[in-house]
Amino acid sequence: MIVPNLITTLDGKEVMVDFFTAEVTQNRTIHIIGEINDDTASYICSEIRYLSRNSKEPLTLILNSPGGSISAGMAIYDTLNASRCEVTTVVEGMAASMAAFLATCAATKGRRFCQPNAEIMVHQPLGGVQGQASDISIAADHINSTKRKMTKIFADSVNLEESKIKALTDRDTWLSAEDALKMGFVDHVGDPMDD
């Protein structure tokens, strides 16, 4: 990925930084682009902690991601909740799987945005395991527990019954920005800069 550099002022000095660093330090905006994995979660959680340690001003999370690891996504979700900052989420391109969870569930109610041509995709947790029958059974119990937990969080965030979330996530369900708005996955179609 090519990231442009900017000349900006940090701590009273002109410095050259990449665009994403400037977004974090000046606008309190964090970007999740690409797969959500342990490395990206570590980086994103560090940015959230840094920003929330210095101020309780609102944060913006911009997502264009196919999703990724449940544990990495939950680390970001928990860190955002612990920050006690108001969180705005903006879907650009797509937010699928764990990215859809973050776009919908990690934001402050009323602050969930989806660009007009962006899409959201939800589905049940994915997993794979091999080994002895007892190990496979333990793994199945774990993924079912994770599914129940995520279904409840989604239902609370979207204000739909858990049975409706279960039906939507049984298979891949793609939502246009307008459909996501109608179903309560986002609060606005457009950009928060337009507000």
Residue ranges of predicted features:
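Terminal-region recognition feature
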Residues: 1-195
